[in-house]
């Protein structure tokens, strides 16, 4: 689905409305969503949609972020109109922005970020109250040079600052995967202990 198309956003909102109305649920959770991760020698071709629906004359990047913001707000509004107690949360990529690109960002050097590459302004969603919780996918080890787990779990906890709940997404699938940092039997228990101590 192309987030730039109003009918795509309405389609998703209608599905969420149906689920929320018909079932006794505690929440709706989105995981890996919206614009695709970059693939070498491939582009997401939404030029025609951009030209047709960019009525605010935004740059392509800002327009894409605005589309995703509209999806998130529309889903939240849909849920809260039907059942205000049902939680809405998202599990985004683990880095919102690098500090080198935005002083509010984390002290990381990630090649992919939510804001710049995936067009997901998770900080805005938190600030606007559009999500009840966030589960950042912090899939790096402590001490990783590009994206240190310790830096990131603290950044998300501090940024959210009670505006939304934070539950860390751990990379359990990487344990014993062959890399030195993930073959360390203490890495995952240590990450869990750090997050619990920061609660």
Question: Which residue stretches match the model-derived regions?
Answer:
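Active-site-adjacent "subsite" loops/lids of carbohydrate-active enzymes
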Residues: 1-18, 22, 116-120
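Aromatic- and acidic-residue-enriched carbohydrate-binding clefts of CAZyme catalytic domains
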Residues: 1-2, 38-65
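Second-shell loop/turn segments in exported
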Residues: 2-6, 58-65, 141-142, 178-181
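Conserved, mostly hydrophobic/aromatic
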Residues: 12, 19, 28-31, 79, ...
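Aromatic-lined carbohydrate-recognition surfaces of secreted/lumenal glycan-active proteins
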Residues: 16, 29-33, 62-114, 164-175
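Generic structural signal for well-ordered alpha-helices
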Residues: 16-20, 69-77, 122-123, 150-157, ...
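Aromatic- and acid-rich polysaccharide-binding/catalytic face
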Residues: 26, 31, 46-58, 107-108, ...
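Substrate-binding cleft of secreted/luminal carbohydrate-active enzymes
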Residues: 119-145, 156-199
